[in-house]
């Protein structure tokens, strides 16, 4: 589909660090859009798209990449678009339900150079020196969601922050 026409109709402004990223003036109901369900685009925060700049800066030839904590798949789909032709991406998520969502999103994206796994991060220790590029966006307390999701504030707790910190240490 024509991304420029599609985004112009929605009063979109380009994200400076992402070639196909756009800020929208209002949040449409994406779940009612057949193009969203077809995998034509993925909705995520602009900050999540910064991974494209890392790839542009450091990756110039095909690589084997690992997105260790990949669900729901925004960074993985963005990586699949940014990595050089001939690269392979392993998108991992140990939580079964989240891994299913990840697999759906990566499949809809339509890039065959990807594999989805459901392993614990420690399982990849035996792959020392196999991956050229590893992305770790470790699970966190969700404070970044406060401005767009009021319920996130209600779900915040010190114990959740501590649990996330322990999980990050394990990863």
Outline where the language-model segments fall.
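S-adenosylmethionine
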Residues: 1-171
């Amino acid at each position: 589909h024509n991304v420029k026409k599609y985004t112009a109709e929605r009063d979109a402004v380009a994200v400076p660090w992402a070639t196909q990223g756009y800020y929208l003036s209002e949040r449409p109901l994406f779940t009612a859009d057949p193009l969203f369900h077809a995998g034509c685009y993925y909705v995520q925060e602009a900050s999540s798209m910064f991974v494209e700049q890392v790839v542009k800066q450091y990756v110039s030839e095909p690589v084997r990449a690992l997105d260790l904590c990949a669900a729901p798949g925004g960074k993985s789909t963005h990586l699949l678009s940014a990595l050089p032709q001939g690269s392979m991406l392993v998108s991992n998520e140990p939580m079964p339900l989240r891994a299913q969502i990840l697999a759906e999103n990566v499949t809809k994206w339509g890039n065959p150079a990807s594999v989805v796994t459901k392993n614990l991060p420690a399982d990849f220790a035996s792959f020392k020196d196999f991956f050229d590029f590893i992305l770790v966006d470790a699970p966190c307390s969700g404070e970044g969601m406060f401005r767009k999701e009021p319920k996130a504030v209600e779900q915040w707790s010190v114990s959740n922050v501590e649990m996330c910190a322990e999980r990050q240490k394990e990863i």
